[in-house]
Amino acid sequence: VWWLLISKHYVVKVNHSKCVHCGFCNLVSSCYSLGDCVGCLSCFYACPYEARELVESHLDTSNLVRVYIDGIEFKVPRNVTVAKALELIGISFNPVGSRGVSLACRTGGCWACAVVIDSTLERSCITPVRDGMRVGLDVEGFKPLRIVHGPEPHLVGGKGTPWWEVNYLEYVETAVWVAGCNLRCPQCQNYHVTYDNVSTPMTPEEVGRLVIHYHRRYRTKGIAISGGEPTINRRWLVEFFRYVSSRVESRVRKHLDSNGTVLTRDYIDELVDVGCNNIGVEPKCVRVETYMRVTGIDDRELAMKYLQTAWEAVKYVYDNY
């Protein structure tokens, strides 16, 4: 059977010796297939006490469900996510950081994986398939969405905030923080934001209106977006900066706080073109071994790619902007 040729299928179980019943898996990173794990692995990535473990399982080939992808009927195992079903039938996702649909955070926060499910934009990475589900791959007619925290005024800013603007007495930026990240840093300072998949998602315009309101209220010199990782939902981020830049004075800093892992030259150019004028990149270190420990990325090749892209982004911004 064709799907048996695909890579192994894993589900998640609770290690009760590590679980402290903190409620994170109910209040922040919720399960969308409760009682019948489909292997999205969101809770595995998100659990702050590492109380989730992977267990090798199998695709339920005895219980197939019908799904319609752009009107074409396919039969897939019932115990998979929409994203997994798409991969099983041979549909590839776009690279992380591209404008197309991509599996970026895999925890449901960034919405970069969203497709049209039964006429509504929904995340493919954590949504289980169900019999009769209709999935559309063209999302251009829908406003991009993302889970966002804030805005809040900030005293110190972030990566790339000019040091001379910071006096620790006045608010220097009005900031928002977006959910979802392509790294797995165990020391993440915004853990509750990064792994949030339950909050109501917002459009770039909705967030733009809020952040501009508080920017004017607190008279900050900059507007900032951090995370999580802002760059992994490219459509959303570009539209956010376009909206904000068209409604505030040019002297206002429009600040991107990024890990730089997907900030390619064309991406940087596109952000600058829509008004982003303050790009802060954090490569984190120089050695790939250190990077793997800091970011939680076990795949050395991927870690090397991310580290190299981040440093190249620093150089490109410095040389050109």
What annotation goes with each model-predicted range?
Residues 12-13, 35-36, 87-121, 171-176:
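Immediate flanking context of iron-sulfur cluster ligation sites
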Residues 44, 104-145:
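Glycine-rich phosphate/adenylate-binding loop and adjacent beta-alpha elements
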Residues 72-81:
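Short, contiguous acidic and Ser/Thr-rich linear segments
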Residues 192-223:
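Conserved alpha-helical substructure of the radical SAM core
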